[in-house]
């Protein structure tokens, strides 16, 4: 059974997707767009921070393990919490050895998903966080 469309959002809410995997970025971009969100994708935390993304984003989805990058998703979470504590941050990971969900929630994350991501659950959480 496919994803049910929950609702279209107006005005467009901007969701930043930070993941070094092109397929994950594209998949999340398409999922978010199908629910009426505007997704802005970044291959690294550094690219996100160098853009106007931090000031424009209504929610951030960040991979915790960003290969070949200087800043991890955890460091990005800490930076966002220091400068924009009101912006929801959802952490994602594909690593089975990653720390438990409670660790990231204690650090200020608003949600945590393991890949492959349950699209309906992700959209439901974003809807909840942005209402």
Show the residue positions of the predicted features:
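Short amphipathic alpha-helix used as the core "switch/output" element in two-component signaling
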Residues: 46-50, 72-85
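Alpha4 helix (beta4-alpha4-beta5 surface) of REC/receiver domains from two-component response regulators
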Residues: 71, 75, 96-111
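Non-catalytic signal-transmission and effector/linker regions of two-component phosphorelay proteins
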Residues: 1-16, 22-23, 29, 46, ...
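A Lys-centered signature of the CheY-like receiver
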Residues: 115
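Two-component/phosphorelay signaling modules centered on CheY-like receiver
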Residues: 21-40
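The short loop immediately C-terminal to the conserved phospho-acceptor aspartate in CheY-like receiver
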Residues: 65-67
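Acidic, metal-coordinating helix/loop segments flanking the phosphotransfer/catalytic sites
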Residues: 41-59
């Amino acid at each position: 059974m496919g994803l049910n469309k929950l609702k279209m959002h107006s005005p467009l809410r901007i969701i930043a997707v930070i993941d070094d995997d092109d397929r994950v970025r594209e998949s999340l971009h398409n999922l978010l767009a199908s629910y009426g969100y505007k997704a802005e994708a970044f291959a690294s935390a550094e690219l996100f921070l160098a853009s106007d993304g931090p000031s424009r984003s209504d929610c951030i989805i960040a991979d915790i393990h960003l290969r070949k990058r200087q800043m991890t998703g955890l460091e990005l979470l800490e930076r966002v919490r220091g400068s924009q504590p009101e912006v929801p941050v959802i952490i994602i990971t594909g690593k089975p050895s990653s720390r438990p969900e409670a660790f990231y929630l204690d650090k200020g994350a608003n949600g945590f998903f393991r890949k492959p991501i349950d699209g309906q659950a992700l959209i439901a959480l974003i809807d909840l966080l942005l209402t």
